[in-house]
UniProtKB/Swiss-Prot annotation:
Gene that encodes it: glnS
Pfam families, per database record: tRNA-synt_1c, tRNA-synt_1c_C, tRNA-synt_1c_C2
Motif segment ('HIGH' region): 36-46
Binding annotation for L-glutamine: D69, Y214
Protein name as catalogued: Glutamine--tRNA ligase
Similarity comment text for this entry: Belongs to the class-I aminoacyl-tRNA synthetase family.
Keyword check for rRNA processing: no
Length: 556
């Protein structure tokens, strides 16, 4: 179950079904499961399913299992098993009991396959892959029966036994369910339920050389675990017929309150790919730095970018659960993290593109300490110490020699307030041989610390800064959307919609209070955005901050 609280319990069609099942007495408890295949890293789409399954279990005082669908050993890895568990925990959830694996049930699944053979409902087929595809037919044309479909039960038992003993080659034969080759649903045209794979399995080793297919395994695993509501995305809607057929034809699962499958729409998020294959292509071709690249939609990538468990859970609650496929605006996810960080992130000052400022009438060699609030509306976050001296750095964009009235920053001959400090006035500047401004010389009003000028003059602009001798060097990674198209999945190739400007790296300075910023610590860098300390590359010797989200939605 979850260890997190939900302010408002959401309502959706699945919860309505559960309410009715409990009211009618069909079920007296609720048991769900999250069943990922350990062949990749979880992404934001999986987070929707995690929040749904664990959230329902929590709200109905039920249980939620974590079960790995590990029936495809060639594509699976123990590293994925470990990362998925870590991601689920990080999101704030805890499964019931031990981690479960479909492979826990391989012996029972084998017995159930034998039961279907004995009932004349499964047969060993020697059609190759191309022949099987040809015999299956199309959506417009019915399939035709395999020449092996009417093999006697005793012979099928013998052949399946030989499959189990490894006496056939991979692809030489497979066990198929005997259903209906004329069914309008392709999944019901005698689907394969066991195939031969001479592959080492991360849980069972080399015990098995035949492995059950997902559609055969999934429903039986649900039933064995007494799952009351098996929640899947809409692409499994047709497969529900096979789900029910398997359980309908096995003696152990005839109870009227057995598990049922319900489908909901998967998450489609703007500017985001969810396909493991396409995401893997980005990683393999080094178009991103890895599965945890902050531009990736993986949980690891979102975490490194600075998204929090609470913001992801809030996003999943806001988008809701429906049967209708739709595209969710990326701005909604941004809003969830922006709102949370606005409330909880301490403020700090960082200068991403430093420009030196010398305050000529400030005493040389003097460094004073200014107390600044860590949060403008949360006194419980306390204060931090800012050093202030004769030399400071401001952002290069915050000074112009000439500007119109809309420019509320430092202009030659005019005043601006330094955040948490004094009012300064630009007097002159130095330039290099190419005309670039290198230093701005200012004067300051010593009687303006924490108050307006005594003579009542108005100073409208406020800019951020850092003190030159105490500021810490830092790298800032400024992330934008990885794709230029709101629907990158529709593009013929990923390359044509890849954003060449999705990452800009700049080197600047942060105030001294951030010298030991812990990994994943979030800050609002005033006037810049919300950032977090990178959880891989940042250290006291080399500070690295990732842009999580802008202060406001630039896509509005």
């Amino acid at each position: 179950m979850s260890h997190v609280d939900t302010e408002v319990r959401p309502s959706n069609f699945i919860r309505n079904i559960i309410d009715e099942d409990l009211k009618s007495g069909k079920h007296t408890n609720v048991q769900t499961r999250f069943p990922p295949e350990p062949n990749g890293y979880l992404h934001i789409g999986h987070a929707k399913s995690i929040c749904l399954n664990f959230g329902i279990a929590r709200d109905y005082q039920g249980l939620c299992n974590l079960r790995f669908d590990d029936t495809n050993p060639e594509k699976e890895d123990i590293d994925y098993v470990n990362s998925i568990q870590a991601d689920v925990r990080w999101l704030g959830f805890q499964w019931d009991g031990e981690v479960r694996y479909s492979s826990n049930y391989f012996d029972q699944l084998h017995q159930y396959a034998v039961e279907l053979i004995n009932k004349g409902l499964a047969y060993v087929c020697f059609l190759n892959a191309d022949e099987t595809r040809e015999y299956r037919g199309t959506l417009k044309e019915p399939g035709k029966n395999s020449p092996y479909r009417d093999t006697p039960v005793e012979e099928n038992l013998r052949l399946f036994g030989k499959m189990r003993l490894g006496e056939f080659k991979e692809g030489e034969c497979a066990l198929r369910a005997k259903i209906d080759m004329a069914s309008p649903f392709m999944c019901m045209r005698d689907p394969v339920i066991y195939r031969i794979r001479f592959a080492h399995h991360h849980q069972t080793g080399d015990k098995w050389c035949i492995y059950p297919m997902y559609d055969f395994t999934h429903c039986i695993s649900d039933a064995l675990e007494h799952i009351t509501h098996s929640l899947c995305t809409l692409e499994f809607q047709d497969n529900r017929r096979l789900y029910d057929w398997v359980l309908d034809n096995l003696d152990d699962f005839q109870a009227p309150n057995r598990t049922r499958q319900y489908e909901f729409s998967r998450l489609n998020l703007e500017y985001t790919l969810m396909s493991k294959r396409k995401l893997n292509d980005l990683v393999t071709r080094k178009l991103v730095t890895g599965w945890d690249d902050p531009r990736m939609p993986t949980i690891a990538g979102l975490r490194r970018r600075g998204y929090t468990p609470a913001s992801i859970r809030e996003f999943c609650q806001r988008i809701g659960i429906t049967k209708q496929e739709n595209m969710i605006e990326a701005a909604m996810l941004d809003a969830c993290i922006r709102e949370e960080l606005n409330e909880h992130a301490p403020r700090a000052m960082a200068v991403l593109r430093p420009l030196k400022v010398v305050i000529e009438n400030y005493p040389e060699g003097q460094i004073e300490t200014i107390q600044a609030a860590s949060h403008p509306s949360d006194e419980s976050m306390g204060t931090r110490e800012l050093a202030f001296g004769r030399e400071i750095f401001i952002d290069v964009a915050d000074f112009r020699e000439e500007a119109n009235k809309q420019y509320k920053r430092l202009v030659m001959g005019k005043e601006v307030r330094l955040r948490n400090a004094y009012v300064i006035k630009a007097e002159r500047c130095d330039k290099d041989s190419e005309g670039n401004i290198t230093t701005v010389y200012c004067s300051y009003d010593a009687d303006t610390l924490g108050k307006n000028p005594a003579d009542g003059r108005k100073v409208k602009g406020v800019i951020h800064w850092v003190e030159a001798t105490t500021a810490k060097p830092a790298q800032f990674r400024l992330y934008q959307r990885l794709f230029t198209d709101p629907n990158p999945a529709a593009a013929e190739t990923v390359d044509e919609v890849l954003n060449p400007n999705s990452l800009e790296v700049v080197n600047g300075l942060v105030e001294a209070s951030l010298a030991n910023a812990p990994a994943e610590k979030a800050y609002q860098f005033e006037r810049e955005g919300y950032f977090c300390a990178d959880n891989k590359d940042s250290s006291a010797d080399h500070l690295v901050f990732n842009l999580t989200v802008a202060l406001r939605d630039s896509f509005e």
